[in-house]
């Protein structure tokens, strides 16, 4: 499966950029892993069942 995330550079804002970064973070972290039981999610090791993350930059 492919998840596409787009950053709109036509009318950028701090909120859109923050949302863009959150979407990337939410789609690459392995929720079953955390850093030293701190509750901080980490990126999981690659597997043969991984999905792809497609990042688009929309410009004028």
From Swiss-Prot:
Alphabetic keyword roster: Antiviral protein, Hydrolase, Pharmaceutical, Plant defense, Protein synthesis inhibitor, Toxin
Top-rank taxon: Eukaryota
InterPro entries, sorted: Ribosome-inact_prot_sf, Ribosome_inactivat_prot_sub1
GO biological process: defense response; negative regulation of translation; regulation of defense response to virus
Molecular function as annotated in GO: rRNA N-glycosylase activity; toxin activity
Keyword Hydrolase listed: yes
EC number: 3.2.2.22
Signal sequence range: none
Enzyme class label: hydrolase
Catalytic activity: Endohydrolysis of the N-glycosidic bond at one specific adenosine on the 28S rRNA
TM regions (residue ranges): none
Stated family: Belongs to the ribosome-inactivating protein family. Type 1 RIP subfamily.
Functional description taken from the UniProt entry: Single-chain ribosome-inactivating protein.
Further comment: Possesses high antiviral potency and low toxicity to normal cells in culture and to intact animals. Capable of inhibiting HIV-1 infection and replication.
Protein known as: Ribosome-inactivating protein dianthin-32
Source organism: Dianthus caryophyllus (Carnation)
Lineage, top ranks: Eukaryota, Viridiplantae, Streptophyta, Embryophyta, Tracheophyta
């Amino acid at each position: 499966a492919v998840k596409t995330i787009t950053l709109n550079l036509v009318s950028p804002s701090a909120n859109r950029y923050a949302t863009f970064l959150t979407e990337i973070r939410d789609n690459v972290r392995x929720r079953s892993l955390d850093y030293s039981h701190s509750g901080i999610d980490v990126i999981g090791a690659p597997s043969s069942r991984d999905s792809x993350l497609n990042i688009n930059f929309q410009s004028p």
